[in-house]
């Protein structure tokens, strides 16, 4: 018997919404389980990654709710910043530079709100149990106020500064970015060997950035490199440009890369920046903020970086300065959003000062439970590798404005008062004079804050939205992907330490990435994108959630049809198991039994009690995959394949004999275990669980399975368990014998010859004959169970 899965799932979405099943009711802290939900961006559609990682959080939310906790599971959208700007530009064709600030902000808000409404339906469709009727957005006045208030808190604590300092910039996105927004990417390029000169002697250096020649301020060699020891302290002439630079020594120079001599430019990479700082070298900028060559680049002025690279090599070749070129593959720092190699500039930017707190960040990270534990190592590696303070300035329109003006007369920085927040200095005039010179000639800060500067405050934003920050902070759980440990996990831990000297949550649960069936990362260019809605239409949301539970927490996953098929088959199996119980039950009402007498019923209740205890332990340990695997085995093999088949002849025989107590007891037991199975599956497959629950006429039913209690009743009948477990082994032997004789399990056979414990097998002769369709059984004593069938 099949079921229209999509129709069934949509029915329960409407029901949960109408009944306010997931509304949070405040309670004492020890009765609350508070979750820091990842607020997705509004820039685009849901994808398979969402249907993998978000259910991981929902599994725990639903489980904790059934364990009696008041679950604070808020929803939000991260709708400020670069992703939204790019989405708006893509949707409308309007660039930020084509519009004024107010108009572009209005456009961003309008499109974001429209996108949020349609996206909400998708999140409901995959069964998320957040409270969607009241959600926060990071662009709201409330969120902006909190973000600006925390900025002023940083000012008071001496943890924020504005300085002319190195900043990382993306030429494509035309904005500064922070170290947490960079990623290393392997790229193919040319290593060009260029001759400098030291008097009449050539000095060959190898570089992947020949377009930076105009910014060369020194040549470095390793002090232990005998080839160049006599050149240290002398000057080299830069080809084409003709200027002279010092030859210096530093142990960081790799003698085995290229020629062992490297030029230092301001700035080609992190190494250039480090040596520039260390030796107080001159500053020459040959690339502007838009990724174009400046006057310092001489004949390359006005060219893009890629065009300049080609042009300078041509010029160097013509001048006889190129020794050779090699094709290499090397690691390049790129902007994680667009993949463009980053550039380093010197400009006035806002920074959060935190490099001196690295040890404290490590310590606080260790106060948090990491699931899986090894993900903490990734966090610590990131913290230990930090080299710069956190740059939080962004040259964009749409974002949280800095609550700052500058005095045009004396240069003083003027901060807004807390009572004025939220404020946008680009639009609003200051309410006060310069507190240094009294001037009213104040100009606004036009930059906005990095998106992560606000996203790092989500525990505060979400809890404050409901007026619960002081009551439930720190929260209990953060769920997120491992790809943003350096973004969201780190920045949230850092801000919590700086502002509150606390941890933001007691546990963080990390999910992996989604790949195609061949282990390839999914992308439009590869043509391997899988549409989430087509998967839901084909298999149902419960099947997608089942798939999400097939790997251990933190592991990556592949999209394999067999996993979705297994999920759908489980949904149908549950539906059909319930239908079979309905048939066996007939018109009878379910009677409750504090104790049961029939050995088969005593056996299944014992097995049920044991498996529920195992599943509970796994769920308490955040081992959802192990819990579901154990449940699958019990449901398919123990409950369906054995128990439900065993009770058919039991009920038939008892009904014929007028033994209605046994009939009622068996109907109760089957319904009770089916209910427990539905409850145990409920966190993972909430739709079919609700369908089963609402159609089991079991006394004491609540408004939804998802607010009912978790199965934890302990009934153990050791006598019956041993006896019936032995009979199950006999059943397995007879089924195997049928298979060996090439007879299907459902086909009737004339004779079955069975060896084993004769007295016990004899006791269950009628059950075995009826269940396995055997006309005649020959039973004999034997040390081991064995069976043969004769069709």
Swiss-Prot record:
Classification via SUPFAM superfamilies: Anticodon-binding domain of a subclass of class I aminoacyl-tRNA synthetases, Nucleotidylyl transferase, ValRS/IleRS/LeuRS editing domain
Record: residues binding ATP: 524
Placement of sequence motif 'HIGH' region: 40-50
Gene3D superfamilies the record matches: HUPs, Isoleucyl-tRNA Synthetase, Domain 1, Valyl/Leucyl/Isoleucyl-tRNA synthetase, editing domain
Catalytic activity: tRNA(Val) + L-valine + ATP = L-valyl-tRNA(Val) + AMP + diphosphate
Protein's UniProt keywords contain ATP-binding: yes
Keyword terms of this UniProt record: Aminoacyl-tRNA synthetase, ATP-binding, Cytoplasm, Ligase, Nucleotide-binding, Protein biosynthesis
The UniProt record lists the keyword Transmembrane: no
Motif stretch ('KMSKS' region): 521-525
Primary localisation category: cytoplasm
Catalytic activity, EC: 6.1.1.9
Any Gene Ontology CC annotation: cytosol
Location relative to the cell: Cytoplasm
One Pfam family of this chain: Anticodon_1
GO terms classed as biological process: valyl-tRNA aminoacylation
GO MF annotations in UniProt: aminoacyl-tRNA deacylase activity; ATP binding; valine-tRNA ligase activity
Domain notes: ValRS has two distinct active sites: one for aminoacylation and one for editing. The misactivated threonine is translocated from the active site to the editing site.
Protein function: Catalyzes the attachment of valine to tRNA(Val). As ValRS can inadvertently accommodate and process structurally similar amino acids such as threonine, to avoid such errors, it has a 'posttransfer' editing activity that hydrolyzes mischarged Thr-tRNA(Val) in a tRNA-dependent manner.
UniProt-recorded name of the protein: Valine--tRNA ligase
């Amino acid at each position: 018997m099949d079921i229209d899965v999509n129709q069934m799932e949509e029915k329960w979405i409407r029901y949960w919404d109408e009944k306010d099943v997931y509304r949070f009711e405040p309670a004492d802290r020890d009765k609350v389980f508070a979750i820091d939900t990842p607020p997705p961006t509004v820039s685009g559609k849901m994808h398979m990654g969402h249907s993998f990682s978000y259910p991981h959080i929902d599994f725990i939310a639903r489980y904790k709710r059934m364990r009696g906790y008041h679950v604070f599971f808020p929803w939000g959208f991260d709708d400020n910043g670069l992703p939204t700007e790019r989405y708006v530009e893509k949707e409308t064709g309007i660039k930020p530079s084509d519009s004024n600030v107010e108009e572009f902000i209005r456009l961003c808000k309008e499109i974001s709100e429209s996108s949020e409404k349609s996206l909400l339906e998708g999140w409901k469709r995959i069964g998320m149990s957040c409270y969607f009727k009241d959600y926060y957005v990071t662009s709201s006045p409330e969120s902006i106020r909190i973000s600006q208030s925390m900025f002023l808190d940083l000012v008071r604590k001496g943890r924020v500064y504005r300085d002319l300092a190195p900043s990382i910039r993306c030429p494509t996105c035309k904005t500064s970015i922070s170290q947490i927004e960079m990623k290393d990417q392997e790229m193919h390029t040319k290593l060009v060997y260029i001759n400098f000169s030291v008097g009449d002697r050539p000095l060959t250096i190898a570089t992947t950035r020949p377009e930076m020649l105009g910014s060369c301020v020194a040549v470095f060699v390793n002090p232990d490199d005998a080839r160049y020891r006599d050149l240290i302290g002398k000057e080299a002439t830069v080809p084409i440009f003709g200027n002279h630079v010092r030859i210096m020594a530093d142990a960081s120079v790799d003698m085995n890369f290229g020629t062992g001599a490297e030029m230092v430019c301001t700035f080609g990479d992190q190494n250039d920046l480090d040596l520039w700082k260390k030796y107080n070298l001159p500053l020459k900028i040959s690339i502007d903020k838009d990724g174009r060559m400046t006057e310092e680049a001489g004949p390359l002025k006005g060219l893009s970086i890629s065009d300049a690279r080609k042009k300078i090599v041509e010029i160097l070749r013509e001048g006889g300065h190129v020794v050779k070129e090699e094709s290499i593959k090397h690691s390049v720092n790129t902007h994680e959003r667009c993949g463009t190699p980053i550039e380093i500039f010197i400009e006035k930017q806002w920074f959060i000062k935190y490099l001196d707190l690295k040890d404290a960040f490590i310590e606080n990270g260790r106060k948090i439970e990491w699931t899986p534990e090894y993900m903490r190592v990734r966090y610590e590696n990131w913290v230990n590798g930090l080299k710069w303070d956190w740059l939080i300035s962004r040259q964009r329109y749409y974002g949280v404005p800095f609550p700052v003006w500058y005095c045009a007369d004396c240069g003083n920085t003027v901060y807004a008062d807390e009572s004025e927040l939220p404020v946008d200095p680009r639009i609003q005039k200051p309410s006060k004079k310069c507190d240094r010179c009294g001037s009213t000639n104040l100009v606004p800060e036009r930059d906005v804050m990095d998106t992560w500067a606000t996203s790092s405050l989500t525990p505060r934003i979400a809890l404050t939205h409901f007026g619960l920050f002081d009551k439930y902070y720190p929260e209990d759980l953060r769920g997120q992907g491992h790809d943003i440990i350096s973004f969201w996990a780190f920045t949230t831990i850092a801000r919590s330490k700086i502002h509150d000297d606390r941890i933001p949550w007691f546990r963080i649960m990390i999910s992996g990435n989604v790949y195609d069936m061949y282990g390839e990362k999914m992308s439009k260019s590869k043509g391997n994108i899988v549409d989430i809605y087509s998967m839901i239409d084909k298999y149902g949301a419960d099947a997608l959630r089942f798939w999400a539970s097939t790997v251990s927490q933190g592991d990556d996953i592949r999209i394999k049809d067999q996993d979705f098929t297994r999920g759908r088959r489980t949904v149908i199996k549950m539906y059909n198991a319930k239908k079979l119980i309905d048939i066996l039950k007939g018109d009878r009402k379910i009677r409750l039994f504090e104790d049961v007498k029939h050995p088969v019923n005593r056996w299944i209740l014992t097995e049920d009690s044991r498996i529920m205890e195992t599943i509970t332990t796994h769920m308490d340990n955040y081992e959802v995959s192990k819990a579901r695997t154990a449940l699958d085995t019990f449901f398919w093999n123990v409950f369906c394949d054995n128990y439900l088949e065993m009770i058919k002849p039991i009920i038939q025989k008892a009904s014929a004999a007028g033994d209605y107590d046994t009939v009622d007891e068996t109907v109760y037991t089957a319904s009770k275990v089916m209910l427990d199975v539905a409850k145990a599956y409920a966190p993972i497959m909430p739709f079919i669980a609700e369908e089963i629950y609402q159609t089991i006429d079991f006394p004491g039913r609540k408004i939804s399975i998802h607010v009912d209690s978790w199965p934890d009743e302990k009934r153990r009948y050791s006598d019956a368990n041993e006896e019936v477990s032995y009979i199950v082994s006999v059943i397995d032997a007879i089924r195997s014998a049928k298979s060996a004789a090439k007879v299907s399990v459902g086909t009737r056979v004339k004779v079955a010859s069975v060896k084993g414990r004769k007295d016990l097998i004899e006791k269950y002769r009628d059950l075995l004959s009826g269940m396995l369709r055997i006309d005649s059984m020959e039973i004999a004593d034997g040390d081991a169970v064995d069976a043969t069938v004769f069709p």
